[in-house]
């Protein structure tokens, strides 16, 4: 038994519950726990230690990433538009921000440094709609210079697809390979291939099969 706390929505999140069993941790209903008042280390859904996303890179082998068979594209340059990927409202509220205010402030900031056209991609709630009928790749290939978002996973997808990105949340999985400074909107960060590959390998070590949650493998890897 360890002192780690696993937050499970209504105690019914099967993935969190399995991970807790595999690690010997303790399950608490999400609605009954305020992590801000606790000194205990916690696990949030997504297998991230004490944070919302994996923002700091850990050097990892490439075995798990190779199994995913996700291609890493060369950088695509020459696009004209700036694509803002509108985030979900829930993480904005977590950080005490209003989505519409953030969006307008972001647009106003971008306009200080460029006269490029700005396009806002609304976040469609249906995952099927986002991934099949109106894909991010299609939007990026439509004359895009770079992508800007708060904490949306679109930045991770964009970098892997070859488009530079700006991530503006305090923590983001793509922080090591993106810029956080909108004054650099005309000269975005193009990390080299080695860095992008190391980053992708790092992310792959945060994705686990359900069997790894149950047998303790996820717990072991998380604490390496």
Where are the regions that the model predicts?
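Active-site and donor-binding regions of nucleotide-sugar-utilizing enzymes
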Residues: 1-47, 134-138, 154-155
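Generic beta-sheet signal
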Residues: 2, 28-31, 121, 150, ...
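Structural motif
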Residues: 2-3, 81, 145-146
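Short, solvent-exposed loop/turn segments at secondary-structure junctions
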Residues: 10-12, 33-35, 87-91, 124-127, ...
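Leloir-type glycosyltransferase catalytic cores
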Residues: 36-79, 175-224
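Conserved catalytic-core segment of nucleotide-activated headgroup transferases in glycan assembly
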Residues: 77-127
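Donor nucleotide-activated moiety binding/catalytic core segment of transferases
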Residues: 111-166
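Gly/Pro- and small hydrophobic-enriched strand-loop and loop-to-helix capping segments
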Residues: 162-180
């Amino acid at each position: 038994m360890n002192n780690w706390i696993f937050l499970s929505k209504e105690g019914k999140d099967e993935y969190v519950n399995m991970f807790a069993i595999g690690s010997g941790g303790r399950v608490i209903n999400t609605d009954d726990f305020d992590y801000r008042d606790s000194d205990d280390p916690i696990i949030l859904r997504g297998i991230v230690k004490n944070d919302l996303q994996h923002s700091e890179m850990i050097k990892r082998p490439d075995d798990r990433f190779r199994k995913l068979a996700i291609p890493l594209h060369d950088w695509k340059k020459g696009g004209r538009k700036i694509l803002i990927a509108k985030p979900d409202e829930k993480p904005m509220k977590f950080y005490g921000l209003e989505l519409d205010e953030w969006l307008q402030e972001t647009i106003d900031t971008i306009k200080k440094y460029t006269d490029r056209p700005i396009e806002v991609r609304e976040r469609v709630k249906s995952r099927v709609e986002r991934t099949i009928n109106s894909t991010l790749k299609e939007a990026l290939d439509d004359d895009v210079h770079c992508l800007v978002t708060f904490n949306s996973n679109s930045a991770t997808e964009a970098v892997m697809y070859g488009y530079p990105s700006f991530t503006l949340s305090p923590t983001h999985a793509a922080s090591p390979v993106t810029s956080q400074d909108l004054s650099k909107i005309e000269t975005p960060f193009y990390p080299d291939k080695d860095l992008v590959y190391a980053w992708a390998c790092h992310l792959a070590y945060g994705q686990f099969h359900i069997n790894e949650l149950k047998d303790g493998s996820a717990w072991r890897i998380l604490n390496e």
